[in-house]
């Protein structure tokens, strides 16, 4: 297979992890990287780097993507920033009409989980327990302190605050876009689970993780939990999942409670790739060929540790 891959946001941690997966896949690929910044390490890791406009400038970004797709004979686009994932989801019909292939989840899954408030409603409808959640404007102090305040959109922990009193609530509420209030799950047992489906089979892989600064996974232990497998299969079935998503759960009182779902490849993608769960490669293969290829076996035990690295020029 000889294909050109367009990978966005190569200045970010996620893109670098995806790039490692692709390079170890054995596929014959040329990776063209884009980013809004040029002074980044990622541009030295790809075969060709092109500076990109911001996705929020929709008309300019749409033209940029259309032009580069044609000029570079791109086979597939992998968006790796939240704003770019949102852009491609919003313009799905446009790119479908042009037969431009993009690595994004199916519309039904995106509609169910892109909004964090809608996520809790969707999961409850599926019979899955979630933290009690309110829109900020409807919240009447039904929850005791501490509780969580976060934005309805986006991923990661940048817009997540633990609120301990009225002053903190008023302060962060005014500084958070589209805030929601959520029950605080008082547990140190946190798990991250990748769910991949090609529309026929469902693959599930979980880590029990320890978080470091910025909410990044610093230590990840491979685990097999039947309850997480059951939750994942219900989610995949109910949204007819096509693609890879990531659910974050805490174990509280013996129950696994999802509190976040990310609608893209997650930052632990290379960790699980190392253990044989190669969802980034499977997804690319499936979009390009209609098959995930040789899945092989993935490991049921092991530990990953995150370390810092440097690139010198």
For every predicted segment, state its role:
Residues 1-103:
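ATP-binding N-terminal substructure of ATP-dependent carboxylate-amine bond-forming enzymes
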Residues 2-6, 146, 192:
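Residues that mark the start of a beta-strand
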Residues 109-188, 197-200, 226:
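Active-site nucleotide/adenylate-binding loops and adjacent lid/helix of ATP-dependent enzymes
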Residues 183-190, 194-244, 251, 262-289, ...:
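ATP-dependent carboxylate/phosphate-activation module, predominantly the ATP-grasp catalytic core
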Residues 255-256:
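Conserved protein kinase catalytic/activation segment
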Residues 282-313:
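Peripheral (often C-terminal) accessory segments that flank ATP-dependent C-N-forming ligase machineries
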